[in-house]
């Protein structure tokens, strides 16, 4: 598969939605739908996709997740200083997000008909670790956490995590062909 455009400058629309990629835009080779939402206090958004798994990652703010018969109120100052909260659900499961303060979330979806148990990933489930320490004069060193991948959630067709580079270091990732090969082969 040939990759098309790999970088752009998306912006939020007047409803607080920023589209990063869809199945049919210029980044369609990613085979995912990824969007970021800015929410005001009291705002409610619902996410439910048939034939797709969905992950809702808190980037910053204070909000309440509601899914199936469960509720969890979570908060995160920002992606740089506090751990991540993420709900991951299979096809057809509704996730309701209520912003208790100004909140920003990332919603990532991909096609997947497999049914699996919904899971709320807490900060302690995906601790930060360092990658590429000492490589390339140590300019590739970065903090990474894997929220889920094929090893953590074998039923998933997605990988979700965060990467933080130290100032002045390269942005990007060294290719891990094993993980990405597994994802592409599904």
Segments from the language model and where they lie:
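Ligand-binding loop in jelly-roll beta-barrel domains
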Residues: 73, 78-118
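Short amphipathic beta-strand/extended segments with alternating polar/hydrophobic composition
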Residues: 48-49, 69-77, 119-123
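Double-stranded beta-helix
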Residues: 103-143
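Glycine- and acidic-residue-biased ligand/ion/polar-headgroup-sensing regions
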Residues: 50-70, 167-169, 173-174, 178, ...
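Fe(II)/2-oxoglutarate oxygenase catalytic core
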Residues: 26-31, 46, 54, 80-81, ...
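Basic/polar N-terminal segments that are highly enriched at the extreme N-terminus
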Residues: 1-3
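A short glycine-rich, His/Asp/Glu-containing loop-to-beta-strand
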Residues: 12-46, 134-178
């Amino acid at each position: 598969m040939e990759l098309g455009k790999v970088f752009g400058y998306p912006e939020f629309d007047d409803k607080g939605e920023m589209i990063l990629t869809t199945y049919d835009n210029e980044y369609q080779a990613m085979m995912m739908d990824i969007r970021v939402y800015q929410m005001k206090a009291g705002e409610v958004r619902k996410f439910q996709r048939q034939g797709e798994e969905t992950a809702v990652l808190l980037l910053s703010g204070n909000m309440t997740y509601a899914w199936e018969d469960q509720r969890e109120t979570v908060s995160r100052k920002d992606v740089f200083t506090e751990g991540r909260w993420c709900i991951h659900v299979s096809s057809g499961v509704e996730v309701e997000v209520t912003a208790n303060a100004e909140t920003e979330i990332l919603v990532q979806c991909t096609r997947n008909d497999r049914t699996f148990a919904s899971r709320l990933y807490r900060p302690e489930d995906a601790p930060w670790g360092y990658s590429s320490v000492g490589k390339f004069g140590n300019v590739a060193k970065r903090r990474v956490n894997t929220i889920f991948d094929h090893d953590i959630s074998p039923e998933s067709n997605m990988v979700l995590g965060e990467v933080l580079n130290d100032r002045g270091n390269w942005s990007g990732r060294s290719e891990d062909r094993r993980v990405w090969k597994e994802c592409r082969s599904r």
